[in-house]
Amino acid sequence: MARGPKKHLKRLNAPKAWMLDKLGGVYAPRPSTGPHKLRESLPLVIFLRNRLKYALTNSEVTKIVMQRLIKVDGKVRTDPNYPSGFMDVITIEKTGEFFRLIYDVKGRFTIHRITAEEAKYKLCKVKRVQTGPKGIPFLVTHDGRTIRYPDPIIKVNDTIQLEIANSKIMDSIKFDSGNLCMITGGRNLGRVGTVVNRERHPGSFDIVHIKDSQGHTFANRLNNVFIIGKGSKAYVSLPRGKGVKLSIAEERDKRLAAKTH
Protein backbone atom coordinates (compact mmCIF):
# COMPACT_ATOMS: atom_id res chain seq x y z
CA MET A 1 0.00 0.00 0.00
CA ALA A 2 1.40 3.40 -0.98
CA ARG A 3 1.80 5.73 1.96
CA GLY A 4 2.40 9.44 1.77
CA PRO A 5 2.87 11.74 -1.18
CA LYS A 6 4.27 10.70 -4.53
CA LYS A 7 7.84 11.90 -4.91
CA HIS A 8 8.66 10.94 -8.48
CA LEU A 9 7.34 11.66 -11.95
CA LYS A 10 8.22 9.43 -14.88
CA ARG A 11 9.28 11.26 -18.00
CA LEU A 12 6.64 9.62 -20.17
CA ASN A 13 3.95 10.69 -17.72
CA ALA A 14 5.09 14.34 -17.61
CA PRO A 15 2.81 16.87 -19.34
CA LYS A 16 3.44 17.06 -23.10
CA ALA A 17 3.55 20.86 -22.80
CA TRP A 18 6.92 20.59 -21.02
CA MET A 19 8.40 19.23 -24.27
CA LEU A 20 10.82 16.81 -22.61
CA ASP A 21 12.44 14.31 -24.94
CA LYS A 22 11.48 10.69 -24.29
CA LEU A 23 15.04 9.41 -24.24
CA GLY A 24 16.50 12.05 -21.95
CA GLY A 25 16.31 9.83 -18.87
CA VAL A 26 13.68 7.94 -16.90
CA TYR A 27 12.39 10.70 -14.63
CA ALA A 28 11.18 14.27 -14.94
CA PRO A 29 11.25 16.95 -12.22
CA ARG A 30 8.10 16.59 -10.14
CA PRO A 31 6.66 20.02 -9.29
CA SER A 32 6.35 20.78 -5.59
CA THR A 33 2.94 21.45 -4.14
CA GLY A 34 1.99 25.04 -4.79
CA PRO A 35 -0.52 27.43 -6.31
CA HIS A 36 -0.93 25.58 -9.62
CA LYS A 37 -1.91 22.00 -10.41
CA LEU A 38 0.80 19.56 -11.48
CA ARG A 39 -0.54 19.19 -15.03
CA GLU A 40 -1.03 22.94 -15.45
CA SER A 41 2.32 24.14 -14.15
CA LEU A 42 5.92 24.48 -15.27
CA PRO A 43 8.68 23.86 -12.68
CA LEU A 44 11.36 26.56 -12.54
CA VAL A 45 14.02 23.97 -13.40
CA ILE A 46 12.42 23.31 -16.80
CA PHE A 47 11.96 27.02 -17.47
CA LEU A 48 15.58 27.91 -16.66
CA ARG A 49 17.30 24.81 -18.05
CA ASN A 50 15.21 23.60 -21.00
CA ARG A 51 13.62 26.85 -22.16
CA LEU A 52 16.06 29.67 -21.39
CA LYS A 53 19.18 27.43 -21.45
CA TYR A 54 20.64 29.37 -18.51
CA ALA A 55 21.80 26.10 -16.96
CA LEU A 56 22.84 22.71 -18.26
CA THR A 57 21.92 20.53 -15.29
CA ASN A 58 19.52 20.42 -12.39
CA SER A 59 22.30 21.18 -9.90
CA GLU A 60 23.21 24.35 -11.84
CA VAL A 61 19.56 25.47 -11.59
CA THR A 62 19.69 24.84 -7.84
CA LYS A 63 22.79 27.05 -7.60
CA ILE A 64 20.98 29.83 -9.50
CA VAL A 65 17.79 29.75 -7.41
CA MET A 66 19.68 29.48 -4.13
CA GLN A 67 21.36 32.81 -4.90
CA ARG A 68 17.83 34.27 -4.63
CA LEU A 69 17.96 35.58 -8.19
CA ILE A 70 14.59 34.28 -9.39
CA LYS A 71 11.29 35.85 -8.38
CA VAL A 72 7.85 34.48 -9.21
CA ASP A 73 5.07 37.05 -8.79
CA GLY A 74 7.43 39.33 -6.87
CA LYS A 75 8.50 36.70 -4.31
CA VAL A 76 11.93 35.06 -4.27
CA ARG A 77 11.60 31.32 -4.91
CA THR A 78 14.51 29.05 -4.01
CA ASP A 79 12.81 25.75 -4.86
CA PRO A 80 13.92 24.52 -8.32
CA ASN A 81 10.69 22.50 -8.58
CA TYR A 82 8.41 25.44 -7.70
CA PRO A 83 5.28 25.16 -9.90
CA SER A 84 4.87 28.40 -11.81
CA GLY A 85 1.72 28.49 -13.93
CA PHE A 86 -0.52 30.44 -16.29
CA MET A 87 -0.18 34.25 -15.99
CA ASP A 88 2.69 34.07 -13.47
CA VAL A 89 5.38 36.74 -13.84
CA ILE A 90 8.94 35.41 -13.55
CA THR A 91 11.56 38.08 -12.85
CA ILE A 92 15.33 37.68 -13.19
CA GLU A 93 16.64 40.95 -11.77
CA LYS A 94 20.29 40.25 -12.48
CA THR A 95 19.65 40.23 -16.24
CA GLY A 96 16.73 42.69 -16.08
CA GLU A 97 14.37 40.19 -17.71
CA PHE A 98 10.67 39.68 -17.12
CA PHE A 99 8.58 36.79 -18.44
CA ARG A 100 4.89 35.97 -18.30
CA LEU A 101 3.89 32.33 -18.58
CA ILE A 102 1.33 32.14 -21.39
CA TYR A 103 0.31 29.27 -23.67
CA ASP A 104 1.01 29.30 -27.39
CA VAL A 105 -1.61 27.89 -29.78
CA LYS A 106 0.03 24.46 -29.61
CA GLY A 107 -0.80 24.43 -25.89
CA ARG A 108 2.75 24.84 -24.60
CA PHE A 109 4.16 27.41 -22.19
CA THR A 110 6.05 29.88 -24.34
CA ILE A 111 8.94 32.19 -23.39
CA HIS A 112 7.05 35.46 -23.47
CA ARG A 113 9.21 38.45 -22.53
CA ILE A 114 7.39 41.48 -21.14
CA THR A 115 8.31 45.02 -20.11
CA ALA A 116 9.03 46.04 -16.53
CA GLU A 117 5.81 48.07 -16.61
CA GLU A 118 3.70 45.04 -17.56
CA ALA A 119 5.46 42.88 -14.98
CA LYS A 120 3.84 44.91 -12.18
CA TYR A 121 0.48 43.20 -12.56
CA LYS A 122 -1.10 39.89 -13.50
CA LEU A 123 -4.57 38.65 -14.37
CA CYS A 124 -6.34 36.17 -12.11
CA LYS A 125 -9.56 34.30 -12.80
CA VAL A 126 -12.05 34.32 -9.93
CA LYS A 127 -12.85 30.74 -8.91
CA ARG A 128 -14.95 31.35 -5.81
CA VAL A 129 -16.69 34.24 -4.06
CA GLN A 130 -18.04 33.66 -0.57
CA THR A 131 -18.42 35.05 2.92
CA GLY A 132 -15.98 33.98 5.61
CA PRO A 133 -16.15 34.08 9.40
CA LYS A 134 -17.65 37.28 10.89
CA GLY A 135 -19.27 38.02 7.54
CA ILE A 136 -16.05 39.03 5.76
CA PRO A 137 -16.47 38.56 1.99
CA PHE A 138 -13.53 37.10 0.07
CA LEU A 139 -12.70 35.68 -3.32
CA VAL A 140 -10.34 32.89 -4.38
CA THR A 141 -8.39 33.09 -7.65
CA HIS A 142 -7.07 30.44 -10.05
CA ASP A 143 -3.60 30.70 -8.48
CA GLY A 144 -4.80 30.06 -4.94
CA ARG A 145 -4.88 33.65 -3.68
CA THR A 146 -7.49 34.74 -1.16
CA ILE A 147 -8.44 38.41 -1.40
CA ARG A 148 -10.67 39.90 1.30
CA TYR A 149 -13.23 42.66 0.86
CA PRO A 150 -13.40 42.57 -2.96
CA ASP A 151 -15.71 44.83 -4.96
CA PRO A 152 -19.21 43.27 -4.70
CA ILE A 153 -19.69 43.44 -8.50
CA ILE A 154 -16.92 40.84 -9.01
CA LYS A 155 -18.46 37.41 -9.61
CA VAL A 156 -17.18 33.89 -10.34
CA ASN A 157 -15.51 33.50 -13.80
CA ASP A 158 -14.68 37.22 -13.96
CA THR A 159 -11.02 38.23 -14.20
CA ILE A 160 -9.25 40.64 -11.86
CA GLN A 161 -6.15 42.68 -12.65
CA LEU A 162 -3.95 42.26 -9.59
CA GLU A 163 -1.07 44.51 -8.59
CA ILE A 164 1.68 42.05 -7.67
CA ALA A 165 3.56 44.22 -5.15
CA ASN A 166 0.68 44.56 -2.67
CA SER A 167 -1.98 42.11 -3.94
CA LYS A 168 -4.49 44.90 -4.56
CA ILE A 169 -7.20 44.63 -7.20
CA MET A 170 -6.54 47.31 -9.84
CA ASP A 171 -9.41 46.49 -12.19
CA SER A 172 -11.90 43.74 -13.00
CA ILE A 173 -13.24 42.38 -16.29
CA LYS A 174 -16.71 40.86 -16.40
CA PHE A 175 -17.37 37.52 -18.08
CA ASP A 176 -19.47 38.95 -20.91
CA SER A 177 -20.01 38.25 -24.57
CA GLY A 178 -17.80 40.49 -26.70
CA ASN A 179 -14.83 40.28 -24.31
CA LEU A 180 -11.47 38.79 -25.27
CA CYS A 181 -10.59 35.42 -23.76
CA MET A 182 -7.88 32.76 -23.82
CA ILE A 183 -8.48 29.02 -23.55
CA THR A 184 -6.58 27.37 -20.70
CA GLY A 185 -7.49 23.71 -21.18
CA GLY A 186 -8.69 21.14 -23.69
CA ARG A 187 -7.87 20.80 -27.37
CA ASN A 188 -8.19 24.55 -28.08
CA LEU A 189 -5.59 25.35 -25.41
CA GLY A 190 -3.85 28.67 -26.07
CA ARG A 191 -6.36 30.03 -28.58
CA VAL A 192 -7.57 33.61 -28.19
CA GLY A 193 -10.95 34.92 -29.33
CA THR A 194 -13.99 36.93 -28.32
CA VAL A 195 -16.85 35.36 -26.39
CA VAL A 196 -19.93 35.00 -28.62
CA ASN A 197 -22.38 33.44 -26.18
CA ARG A 198 -22.66 31.09 -23.21
CA GLU A 199 -24.95 28.05 -23.17
CA ARG A 200 -26.10 27.19 -19.68
CA HIS A 201 -26.48 23.50 -18.85
CA PRO A 202 -27.59 23.14 -15.21
CA GLY A 203 -26.07 20.02 -13.68
CA SER A 204 -23.55 19.73 -16.49
CA PHE A 205 -20.85 21.92 -18.02
CA ASP A 206 -21.70 25.34 -19.44
CA ILE A 207 -20.45 25.70 -23.02
CA VAL A 208 -18.94 28.96 -24.27
CA HIS A 209 -18.81 29.75 -28.00
CA ILE A 210 -15.80 31.77 -29.10
CA LYS A 211 -14.78 33.45 -32.34
CA ASP A 212 -11.15 34.30 -33.15
CA SER A 213 -9.81 37.22 -35.19
CA GLN A 214 -9.76 35.09 -38.37
CA GLY A 215 -13.48 34.36 -38.03
CA HIS A 216 -13.07 30.71 -36.94
CA THR A 217 -15.56 29.68 -34.25
CA PHE A 218 -15.02 27.01 -31.60
CA ALA A 219 -16.64 25.98 -28.33
CA ASN A 220 -15.17 25.21 -24.94
CA ARG A 221 -16.20 24.45 -21.40
CA LEU A 222 -16.70 27.46 -19.21
CA ASN A 223 -14.02 26.49 -16.69
CA ASN A 224 -11.37 26.51 -19.47
CA VAL A 225 -12.18 30.07 -20.57
CA PHE A 226 -10.03 32.85 -19.09
CA ILE A 227 -11.09 36.45 -19.89
CA ILE A 228 -8.01 38.54 -20.76
CA GLY A 229 -9.46 41.83 -22.04
CA LYS A 230 -12.40 44.17 -22.46
CA GLY A 231 -13.76 44.25 -26.01
CA SER A 232 -10.86 43.52 -28.34
CA LYS A 233 -8.25 45.18 -26.09
CA ALA A 234 -6.11 42.64 -24.23
CA TYR A 235 -4.84 43.60 -20.76
CA VAL A 236 -1.65 41.57 -21.30
CA SER A 237 0.62 41.35 -24.33
CA LEU A 238 0.15 38.13 -26.30
CA PRO A 239 2.89 35.88 -27.73
CA ARG A 240 3.71 35.66 -31.42
CA GLY A 241 0.70 34.59 -33.48
CA LYS A 242 -1.69 36.39 -31.08
CA GLY A 243 -3.44 33.13 -30.19
CA VAL A 244 -4.75 32.42 -33.70
CA LYS A 245 -4.56 28.73 -34.57
CA LEU A 246 -3.87 28.05 -38.23
CA SER A 247 -5.11 24.93 -39.98
CA ILE A 248 -2.47 22.49 -41.26
CA ALA A 249 -2.89 23.81 -44.82
CA GLU A 250 -2.55 27.43 -43.66
CA GLU A 251 0.59 26.57 -41.70
CA ARG A 252 2.07 24.90 -44.79
CA ASP A 253 1.30 27.93 -46.99
CA LYS A 254 2.87 30.22 -44.41
CA ARG A 255 6.04 28.12 -44.30
CA LEU A 256 6.28 28.05 -48.10
CA ALA A 257 5.77 31.81 -48.29
CA ALA A 258 8.55 32.32 -45.74
CA LYS A 259 10.90 30.11 -47.81
CA THR A 260 10.28 31.97 -51.07
CA HIS A 261 11.07 35.39 -49.54
From Swiss-Prot:
Superkingdom per UniProt: Eukaryota
UniProtKB keywords: Ribonucleoprotein, Ribosomal protein, RNA-binding, rRNA-binding
Keyword Ribonucleoprotein: yes
Listed GO MF terms: rRNA binding; structural constituent of ribosome
Keyword NAD: no
An annotated GO cellular component: cytosolic small ribosomal subunit
Protein family (similarity comment): Belongs to the eukaryotic ribosomal protein eS4 family.
Residue stretches making up the S4 RNA-binding domain: 42-104
CDD domains: KOW_RPS4, S4
SMART domains: S4
Pfam families (alphabetical): 40S_S4_C, KOW, Ribosomal_S4e, RS4NT, S4
Organism (species): Carabus granulatus (Ground beetle)
UniProt gene name: RpS4
GO BP of this protein: translation
Protein name: Small ribosomal subunit protein eS4
